[in-house]
Amino acid sequence: MNKLLLFLLIVFNSTLVFAQRTDSSASKPGKVRNVDGSIMNPSKSIQENILASPNFSTLSSIMREDTTNIFSGTPITVFAPDNKAFSRLPAGTVDTLLLPVHKPDLLNLLKYHAVAGKITSNDIERQIKAGNGRATFTTLSGRTLTAKINENRNIVLTDENGGQSVISRLDVQQSNGILYVITQVLLPKFTP
């Protein structure tokens, strides 16, 4: 009886082990991903996916002011603040940036969220290790962002003003690069 019980226990446990599933869509390029309720199609550009995503409507409104289509070039890595990130800015900030007089600042802000080349989270982590805990990236605006890994193993970006943003979604493959979702808007130093 004990042997039968032991046998059934082993069979049951091994069935549980083999029955577990993981979401492999995050690691396989070419799969459509749901990013916080927004569908990201890897056959579309970063710009196309952001403009079609309700979770990025604030970023979309800013991007519509960009006649150069910064996020449609190839290859790029974009750190995209979602609507929650923009809601953390002081009231009126986005409306002020959308004024015609602030168009250069607006474009600078967009460029500050993009880096040339396809940079995976593994690449970022390797650069952080090689940099003794910090990695510096030059954005399309010519300004820098610093990356580190915090105590919770999250990649944290620090802007030129000391503001920090956690990367909440990693390695969202797009036709022209990689998109990351971030929790705060990164702000470059604005020079008058």
Residue ranges with predicted function:
Residues 1-24:
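Bacterial Sec-dependent N-terminal signal peptides
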Residues 18-192:
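Mature, structured domains of secreted/extracytosolic soluble proteins
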